[in-house]
């Protein structure tokens, strides 16, 4: 997405571009997109048509780097998908131990108020 497109972004357009970048799983592309979308109306915790947030999709894909990036930009690890599963449930079920450990650490850190 070009700077010109980002400067005139609308919420639906921005969400669509964001969801597409998550599906691609390219961490560098998504980081650039998130940094450039700071002036847009944008919600990193929005639900896509499949009832998943970007964080849920990244966990399903087993992409720890993308999970970390999304959390850095405000993804809520406590949100449940349409089936009632949190990112931690999905990671455990999928056997993504690295993501499980990361999410537990983040949850403990958030619970301690730090």
UniProtKB/Swiss-Prot annotation:
* Keywords, ordered alphabetically: ANK repeat, Developmental protein, Repeat
> Which parts pass through the membrane?
none
Gene3D superfamilies assigned to the protein according to its UniProt record, in alphabetical order:
Ankyrin repeat-containing domain
From what superkingdom does this record's organism come? Eukaryota
User: Could you tell me which residues the ANK repeats occupy?
Assistant: 50-79, 83-112
Q: Which PANTHER family match?
A: MYOSIN BINDING SUBUNIT, ISOFORM O (PTHR24179:SF21), PROTEIN PHOSPHATASE 1 REGULATORY SUBUNIT 12 (PTHR24179)
Function comment: Downstream effector of Notch signaling. Involved in the regulation of liver cancer cells self-renewal. Involved in the regulation of canonical Wnt signaling by stabilizing LEF1. Involved in angiogenesis acting downstream of Notch at branch points to regulate vascular density. Proposed to integrate endothelial Notch and Wnt signaling to control stalk cell proliferation and to stablilize new endothelial connections during angiogenesis. During somitogenesis involved in maintenance of proper somite segmentation and proper numbers of somites and vertebrae.
Quaternary structure, per UniProt, is: Interacts with LEF1.
Q: What is this protein called?
A: Notch-regulated ankyrin repeat-containing protein
UniProt organism field? Mus musculus
Q: Which gene encodes it?
A: Nrarp
């Amino acid at each position: 997405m070009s700077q010109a497109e980002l400067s005139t972004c609308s919420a639906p357009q921005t969400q669509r571009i964001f969801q597409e970048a998550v599906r691609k799983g390219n961490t560098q592309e998504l980081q650039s997109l998130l940094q450039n979308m700071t002036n847009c109306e944008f919600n990193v915790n929005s639900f896509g048509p499949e009832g998943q947030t970007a964080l849920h999709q990244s966990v399903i894909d087993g992409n720890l780097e993308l999970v970390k990036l999304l959390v850095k930009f405000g993804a809520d690890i406590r949100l449940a998908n349409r089936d009632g599963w949190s990112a931690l449930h999905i990671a455990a079920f999928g056997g993504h131990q690295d993501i499980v450990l990361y999410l537990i650490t983040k949850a403990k850190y958030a619970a301690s108020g730090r």
